[in-house]
Swiss-Prot record:
Signal peptide: none annotated. Belongs to the KAE1 / TsaD family. Required for the formation of a threonylcarbamoyl group on adenosine at position 37 (t(6)A37) in tRNAs that read codons beginning with adenine. Is involved in the transfer of the threonylcarbamoyl moiety of threonylcarbamoyl-AMP (TC-AMP) to the N6 group of A37, together with TsaE and TsaB. TsaD likely plays a direct catalytic role in this reaction. Binds 1 Fe(2+) ion per subunit. It comes from the Bacteria. Fe cation binds at H114, H118, D301. Keywords: Acyltransferase, Cytoplasm, Iron, Metal-binding, Transferase, tRNA processing. It comes from Streptococcus equi subsp. zooepidemicus (strain MGCS10565). Its cofactor is Fe(2+). It catalyses: L-threonylcarbamoyladenylate + adenosine(37) in tRNA = N(6)-L-threonylcarbamoyladenosine(37) in tRNA + AMP + H(+). The gene is tsaD. One of its GO terms (cellular component) is cytoplasm. One of its GO terms (biological process) is tRNA threonylcarbamoyladenosine modification. Its EC number is 2.3.1.234. This is tRNA N6-adenosine threonylcarbamoyltransferase.
Length: 338
């Protein structure tokens, strides 16, 4: 049997990444050029800055990925690329590079949904069992996705306002923590207690929707009022109280989803899946089925996860023409409607 090699490109936000996947789930290389330091002084991602950085480094990422994988372009089977959702300018840089490379080397182009990439990063751990439920938690998305078979995604619940990762960054900014704030809030939370008892929105409703705007407002109001009165708040307890509320919401909705949709396993993926508090709660509270979480190196944005999702799409015969365009608001339901 001839080995299959898929080169994948990811540029949907502030990470420029190129990876090479061998056969079904063996990552030979996963080059990531991070822009975190460039955006830190702005307190968040600046789209124009992100696009310019992608342009500056993407060619080098291609070269490094092939060199590290010890392959030539002629060894490749296909090229995969994220075409949405994400920042339109950032997406277009990766798309242009991937399409040019595919055209120059006469390779098929595989379109990949960025969030499907996060979900399918779990494939590196081994074969997934279907149907499965997935909790996708990142800076831009909070979704419960029911996957009936490989490549068939159905959103059964999502946030009505901010994504959970965005909520972490917003309250982190209020506390004066550096961007991105998720990791530091998680670390501080482990040193504090749930003292402030923030609200947990829509916990008792039967639906699977999320909301974090009320939690953010309660946090900001508490912090502002304390400053006005000259009261000192304990940073560790603030973080612990915020994280406890977030995790209560995520766990409650996930448990409801598992009751409503027969599932053989739970996949938890996305940047926030790196949160140690979330991992601890999942291990403690969901014990009646397998919980699969990608390794930390595959939780943030990276092309390795895009390659793992692309392998599924390639097996299903999903390829795109070279007129494939960026879809910054791409949803799972429109995934194969290029």
């Amino acid at each position: 049997m001839t080995d299959r090699y898929i080169l994948a490109v990811e540029s949907s936000c502030d990470e420029t990444s190129v990876a090479v996947l061998k056969n079904d789930n063996v990552l030979l290389t996963n080059i990531i050029a991070s822009q975190v330091e460039s955006h830190k002084r702005f307190g968040g991602v600046v789209p124009e800055v992100a696009s310019r950085h992608h342009v500056e480094v993407i060619t080098t990422c291609f070269d490094d990925a092939l060199k590290e994988a010890q392959l030539e372009a002629s060894d490749l089977t296909a090229v995969a690329v994220t075409y949405g959702p994400g920042l339109v300018g950032a997406l277009l840089v990766g798309l242009a590079a991937a399409k040019a490379f595919a055209w120059a080397n006469d390779l098929p182009l595989i379109p990949v949904n960025h969030m499907a990439g996060h979900l399918m990063a779990a494939r590196e751990q081994g074969e997934l069992e279907y149907p499965l439920m997935a909790l996708l938690v990142s800076g831009g998305h909070t979704e419960l996705v029911y996957v009936t078979e490989p490549g068939e995604y159905h959103i059964v619940g999502e946030t009505r306002d901010d994504a959970v990762g965005e909520a972490y960054d917003k309250v982190g900014r209020v506390m004066g923590l550096p961007y991105p704030a998720g990791r530091e809030i998680d670390q501080l939370a482990h040193q504090g207690t749930d003292t402030y008892h923030f609200p947990r929105a829509m916990m008792k409703e039967d639906h699977l929707e999320f909301s974090f705007s009320g939690l953010q407002s309660a946090f900001i109001n508490l912090h502002h009022n304390a400053q006005q009165k000259g009261e000192e708040l304990v940073l560790e307890d603030l973080c612990a109280s915020f994280q406890a509320a977030v995790l209560d919401i995520l766990l409650a909705k996930t448990k409801k989803a598992l009751k409503q949709y027969p599932s053989k396993m739970l996949v938890v993926a996305g940047g926030v899946a790196a949160n140690q508090g979330l991992r601890e709660r999942l291990a403690k509270e969901i014990t009646d089925l397998a919980v699969v979480i990608p390794p930390l190196r595959l939780c943030g944005d990276n092309a390795g996860m895009i390659a793992l999702a692309a392998a599924v799409e390639y097996d299903k015969g999903h390829v795109a023409d070279l007129d494939l365009n960026a879809k910054p608001s791409l949803a799972f339901e429109s995934f194969h409607q290029q």
